[in-house]
Regions:
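Juxta-kinase regulatory segment immediately upstream of eukaryotic protein kinase catalytic domains
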Residues: 2-48
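ATP/Mg2+ or Mg2+-diphosphate-binding catalytic cores
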Residues: 20, 251, 279-301
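An alpha-helical support segment within catalytic cores of ATP-dependent transferases
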Residues: 27-36, 143-203, 214-215, 257
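A conserved alpha-helical element in kinase catalytic cores
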Residues: 30-33, 55-57, 66-111, 115-138, ...
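Active-site acidic catalytic loop and adjacent metal/ATP-binding pocket
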Residues: 48-64, 100, 187-233
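A glycine-centered beta->alpha junction motif in the catalytic cores
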Residues: 77, 94, 106-125, 140-144, ...
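Active-site Asp-x-Gly
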Residues: 213-258, 265
Length: 301
C-alpha cells in the first residue's frame, strides 16, 4: 500500500482544489489515499512522488512489470479526465503528446506514460522551429472527424468562456476596470472561436509549463485541457511569451505562421489581442506594473 504521507493532500494542494471545485471536494480529498492505493494495485504501479496543480493530483510511479516511469493522475472531476483521455487517444499516432496507458474517467483517473528526460521547457530558451514542429504534429496527427455523439470534448467557445469566467471571478480588488477589460476581451475571443475556417482537436493549455523535452530534444505536450475548434488557439502563448511591443508580437506571429502550414498569421495576431488581458490577469492582480504586463493588458483595446 502506498505511504499515506505521500498520498494525503498537503494543505496548499488542498486549498488549490477547494478554490477550483468548492467545498464539495473535501470528501474527495479525504478519500484520495484509499483511491490511489486501489488504482496503484489495479494498474501495477508504485507511487514514488506527488505533485499537481489546481485540477488534479499527480503521482510519479514505477511500473512493477518493467520498472518504467509512469504517472498516475487523479482529478475530482470525471469530465476533466474524460476530456483528457479522449484527446490523448486522438493524438495516439504522434510521439509529441504524452501517451495514455490506461484510463478510468468515471473515477477521474488516468495512467500516463513517462517522458524522458522530461525537462520542462518553462524557464528555458526555446527555438521557434521546435515549437512549430510541435504545433504541426498536433494539427496533423489529430482526428479527421469532428467529435460524435457521446464525445466528452466540447467546443473551443466553452473553453474560452470557462477561462474568462474564472478570471472574472478572481478579478477582486482590480475593480470595474479589470472586469470591463476582461469582458471586452472575452467577446473578441468568443467571436474568433465562432469564426474559425477550420476545426480540429485543440490542446487548450499549450504553454511552456505543459511542454517537456523528450527523446532527441523533441517537444512533448502534456496536460491538455482539450476542445474542438480553431487550432490556431494553441499558438497564442508562444507568440506572446517574452514579448512586450507590438512590433515584436507581429514579428513572432509572422515567423511562427510561416513555419506551420495552415496557421493563419492574422487570426493568430487577433487571438493574441483577445487573450493578452487574460494572460496578464494574474500579474495585474498581484499589483505588477511592468512593461510586459501593461503591454498585455493593452492588447484588447
Amino acid at each position: 500500500m502506498p505511504d499515506p504521507r505521500l498520498t494525503t493532500l498537503p494543505p496548499p494542494a488542498r486549498a488549490r482544489l477547494l478554490a477550483r471545485f468548492g467545498p464539495a471536494v473535501d470528501a474527495w480529498c479525504e478519500a484520495l489515499p484509499d483511491q490511489v492505493a486501489e488504482l496503484a494495485e489495479r494498474w501495477g504501479v508504485e507511487p514514488l512522488a506527488a505533485g499537481g496543480g489546481g485540477t488534479s493530483r499527480v503521482f510519479r510511479c514505477r511500473r512493477r512489470a518493467d520498472e518504467r516511469a509512469v504517472w498516475l493522475k487523479v482529478t475530482p472531476d470525471p469530465q476533466v479526465a474524460a476530456e483528457e483521455a479522449e484527446a490523448l487517444e486522438g493524438w495516439e499516432r504522434t510521439p509529441s503528446v504524452a501517451g495514455l496507458l490506461a484510463a478510468d474517467p468515471g473515477a477521474g483517473a488516468l495512467l500516463l506514460d513517462g517522458v524522458e528526460p522530461g525537462t520542462p521547457v518553462r524557464g528555458q530558451e526555446w527555438e521557434p522551429a521546435q515549437v512549430a514542429a510541435l504545433l504541426r504534429e498536433l494539427r496533423q496527427s489529430g482526428p479527421d472527424q469532428a467529435p460524435g455523439e457521446g464525445s466528452a470534448l466540447r467546443p473551443l467557445a466553452h473553453r474560452v468562456g470557462f477561462l474568462f469566467g474564472l478570471a472574472l471571478r478572481r478579478a477582486g480588488p482590480d475593480g470595474p476596470d479589470a472586469e470591463i477589460r476582461l469582458r471586452r476581451a472575452r467577446a473578441q475571443a468568443l467571436e474568433l472561436a465562432a469564426s474559425a475556417p477550420t476545426a480540429g482537436l485543440v490542446h487548450g493549455d499549450l504553454h511552456a509549463a505543459n511542454v517537456l523535452r523528450g527523446p532527441g530534444g523533441r517537444l512533448v505536450a502534456i496536460d491538455p485541457r482539450p476542445a474542438w475548434g480553431d487550432p490556431d488557439f494553441d499558438a497564442v502563448d508562444w507568440v506572446l511569451e517574452g514579448v512586450s511591443t507590438p512590433g515584436a508580437l507581429r514579428e513572432r506571429t509572422v515567423l511562427l505562421a510561416g513555419l506551420v502550414p495552415g496557421l493563419d498569421a492574422d487570426r493568430l495576431h487577433a487571438w493574441a489581442h483577445a487573450l493578452g488581458a487574460l494572460l496578464a490577469a494574474p500579474a495585474a492582480r498581484a499589483g505588477h506594473d511592468d512593461v510586459r504586463t501593461r503591454f498585455l493588458l493593452g492588447l484588447g483595446g
